[in-house]
Structures are given as structure tokens and as C-alpha cells.
Amino acid sequence: MQTLEEHCWSCSCTRGRDKKGTKVSAWLARRVGKAMSSLNSLLSLAYSTLASSEGRSLIQRSLVLFTVGVFLALVLNLLQIQRNVTLFPEEVIATIFSSAWWVPPCCGTAAAVVGLLYPCIDSRIGEPHKFKREWASVMRCIAVFVGINHASAKLDFANNVQLSLTLAALSLGLWWTFDRSRSGLGLGITIAFLATLITQFLVYNGVYQYTSPDFLYIRSWLPCIFFSGGVTVGNIGRQLAMGSSEKTHGD
């Protein structure tokens, strides 16, 4: 009798475990099915975006902005190194422009992000940029930005405070001349702040260094360069976005 009871109890436990295992398997199957469905939807959305004209335009603008950022990084960094403003370790100086290999790709990526962000913010806040929207103005803005960077390496002042104030005035003048939007001013200040923090982190960890640092391991005028660079790249991104929008409407 006792053996029969033990047999019945073991059978009921086995059925309970089987039932519980079946529930777990069914739950896992549902979760996997939902995950696969979400992945399929995401891939379909990505494919449709890339296949659309807007997706192609986004990729083209990103590539153009990346190329511009790489080119400006090479040229401007060459100006700084020629004046011994920035110093890289000898083992790092390996390219034709005597620049660390990672600087141009990082600047290109940052230019692509900033250039795409400016028109996106304009559309989000409902403040389309309408001031001097032509390529001639953009090219003049680039020339002024290069001039500001060259001045930071070329001009000699009695102290760095005078140089920093002069470059700050020139940077604000660049924004006022070629932008004048609140979003451009806000993004320029944000970019200058974040880029300065990143630069301080790199210098602090010995990736490279500045000669005669006067502001937390770096030069005090560096935020002015980042601000004017953000405004310049933002104008390029806006002009590219306007051109792609007109082309889309024309099609």
C-alpha cells in the first residue's frame, strides 16, 4: 500500500514538473517570437529608410560633413603644430601632416554629428535658419574660421587673457555675421563646453599636450575655437540640408 502511494506521489510530481517545464518553454518561445518580430520590424525600417530619398540624402550629407571635418582637422592642426602650440609624442607623429592618426577621423565624426544636429534642432524648435542661406556665405564663414584658428597660433599678445578675449570677440562676430540664430548660439556654447572637457581629459591622460597651458592643462582660447568651429560646421550642415530638401521637393 505504501509503495502504491509513493508511486502515485512520484507520478504527480513528474506531471507537475512536466507542466511547469511546458509553461517555461511556451514563455520562452513567446519571448523569442516577440524579439524576432521586433528585430524584423527594425531591419525593415532601416532598409526602407536607406532606400528612401531622405535616407540617401542623410548618408550623403554625413559623408560630406565627415570629409570636411577631416580636411579642416588636417589643415588646422598643421597650423598649430607649425607654431608649436600642440605637441604630440614622437612615436605618434607618423602622418604626412604630422598629426596623430586618430585626430582627423574623430574631427570628421564630430563634424558629421554637429552638421546633422543643427538643421534637426532648427526643425524641432520651429526656427528655420533663413539668414544668409547661400554657399558663398558658407565659404566665407569657413575662411573666417580658418583665420581665427590661424590667429590663435600666429598672434603674439602680452598675455593669454588678451588673446582669449580677442578670439572670443572674433568667434561671437563670426556667429553674428553668418548665423544670428538662438539655436546656433546655444549649440555653439554647448559644443565648446563638451569639446573642452574632452580635450582636458585627453591632455590629462598624456595623449598630447599644449605648450604654455594656462587653463586646466590647455590654452584658455581653445573654447573659442570650438565655438566658431561648431557654428561653421553647423552652417555647412544647414546648407546641405536645405539643398537636399529642395531636391526632394523638386523630385
UniProtKB/Swiss-Prot annotation:
Tagged with keyword Nucleotide-binding: no
Site positions per UniProt: Required for the recognition of 25-hydroxycholesterol: 145
Compartments where found: Endoplasmic reticulum membrane
Example GO BP: cellular response to insulin stimulus
KxHxx (motif): residue ranges: 245-251
Topology with respect to the bilayer: Multi-pass membrane protein
Keyword tRNA processing annotated: no
Any one of the GO CC terms: SREBP-SCAP-Insig complex
All ranges on the Extracellular side of the membrane: 82-100, 157-159, 206-219
Single annotated GO MF: oxysterol binding
Pfam family, one: INSIG
InterPro entries assigned: INSIG_fam (IPR025929)
Keywords from the named record: Cholesterol metabolism, Endoplasmic reticulum, Lipid metabolism, Lipid-binding, Membrane, Steroid metabolism, Sterol metabolism, Transmembrane, Transmembrane helix
Cytoplasmic-side segments: 1-58, 119-133, 179-183, 238-251
Domain characteristics, as noted in the entry: The KxHxx motif mediates association with the coatomer complex. Binds oxysterols in a pocket within their transmembrane domains and interacts with SCAP via transmembrane domains 3 and 4.
Annotated family: Belongs to the INSIG family.
Protein's name according to its UniProt entry: Insulin-induced gene 1 protein
